[in-house]
């Protein structure tokens, strides 16, 4: 089963360190940002330590790396040309890094229309993606299902479908299905996941889903908040998320946890991924998980 989490990529070890961290959590796949998600400071491809990273991955049976684009990219922005241009240029560079790392998909938040309206935002995203997807490599951009916070685009399957339909080289577009976001956007992920998936299939096609973000939600369905919770401790609940992780439709695609670190003290928070992954492998909820994470 391809199950992993977001892991860090930093220091001198870079990808090697990411692979070691994923192995220590008992993962078979993992997701990285190529640098801090809040800025555009990046190391050169030569400094990402890719060869050693791949050696560690081979040794420990890790595969299907996923890259996540930084949050600062907003190609839906119609009011500031510099924001749009930065997004297009930086996304092209990120795709080059993604290809060098050996990942097939880079996850992208479609963007926010910042008041110009959904139609204008979608048209701008299409314009940006058409600019980005001209070069000849095989990296896909995985558009993420969004919660609908603020002026986010991608809160409905229809919005994502409109983007995909407008892009010329749309064979290089995939979808990252985020359980928390989709729940927060109003879909009944908790009680009728197959119904949600059928709806997605009719509007977009389930074969477009190439990454799943597995997150519980701190808020009730339709809250449009996007606040992740640990597996089984939120409004979606363990049973629904366990069902999704083991779903036949997602058997061969990476399922990535982005759940929050545990702990009240901001200086002493601990990653939950090792124990959450064990729990999902055993298919048994552990109400003591958070306490056990702090005792690690």
UniProtKB/Swiss-Prot annotation:
Residues given in the record as Zn(2+) 3 binding sites: 181, 226, 228
Residues at which Zn(2+) 1 binds: 68, 109, 144
Residues annotated to bind Zn(2+) 2: 144, 178, 213, 258
Enzyme class: hydrolase
GO MF terms, alphabetically ordered: deoxyribonuclease IV (phage-T4-induced) activity; DNA binding; DNA-(apurinic or apyrimidinic site) endonuclease activity; phosphoric diester hydrolase activity; zinc ion binding
Keywords tagged on the record: DNA damage, DNA repair, Endonuclease, Hydrolase, Metal-binding, Nuclease, Zinc
GO biological process, one term: base-excision repair
Catalytic activity reported: Endonucleolytic cleavage to 5'-phosphooligonucleotide end-products
Cofactor: Zn(2+)
One Pfam family named in its UniProt record: AP_endonuc_2
Cofactor annotation remark: Binds 3 Zn(2+) ions.
EC number: 3.1.21.2
Domain of life: Bacteria
HAMAP family recorded: Nfo (MF_00152)
Family: Belongs to the AP endonuclease 2 family.
General function of this protein: Endonuclease IV plays a role in DNA repair. It cleaves phosphodiester bonds at apurinic or apyrimidinic (AP) sites, generating a 3'-hydroxyl group and a 5'-terminal sugar phosphate.
Protein name as it appears in the record: Probable endonuclease 4
Gene that this polypeptide is encoded by: nfo
């Amino acid at each position: 089963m391809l199950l992993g989490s977001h892991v860090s990529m930093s220091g001198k070890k870079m990808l090697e360190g990411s692979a070691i961290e994923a192995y220590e959590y008992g993962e078979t796949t993992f997701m990285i940002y190529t640098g801090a998600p809040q800025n555009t400071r990046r190391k050169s491809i030569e400094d990402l330590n890719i060869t050693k990273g791949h050696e560690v991955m081979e040794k420990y049976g890790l595969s299907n790396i996923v890259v996540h684009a930084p949050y600062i990219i907003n190609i839906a922005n119609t009011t500031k040309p510099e924001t749009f241009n930065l997004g297009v240029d930086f996304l092209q560079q990120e795709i080059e890094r993604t290809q060098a790392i050996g990942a097939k998909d880079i996850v992208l938040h479609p963007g926010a229309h910042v008041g110009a309206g959904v139609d204008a935002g979608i048209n701008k995203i299409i314009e940006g993606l058409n600019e980005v997807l001209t070069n000849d490599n095989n990296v896909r951009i995985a558009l993420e299902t969004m919660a609908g916070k603020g002026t986010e685009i991608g809160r409905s399957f229809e919005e994502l479908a409109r983007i995909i339909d407008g892009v010329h080289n749309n064979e290089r577009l995939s979808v990252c299905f985020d359980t928390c976001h989709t729940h927060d956007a109003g879909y009944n992920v908790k009680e009728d996941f197959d119904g949600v998936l059928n709806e997605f299939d009719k509007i977009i096609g389930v074969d477009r889903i190439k990454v799943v973000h597995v997150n519980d939600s701190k808020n009730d369905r339709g809250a449009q908040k996007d606040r992740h919770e640990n597996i089984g401790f939120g409004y979606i609940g363990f049973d629904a998320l366990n069902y999704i992780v083991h779903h036949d439709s997602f058997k061969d695609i990476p399922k990535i946890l982005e759940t929050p670190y545990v702990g009240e003290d901001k200086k002493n928070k601990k990653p939950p991924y090792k124990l959450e992954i064990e729990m999902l492998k055993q298919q048994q909820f552990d109400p003591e998980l958070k306490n056990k994470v702090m005792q690690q």
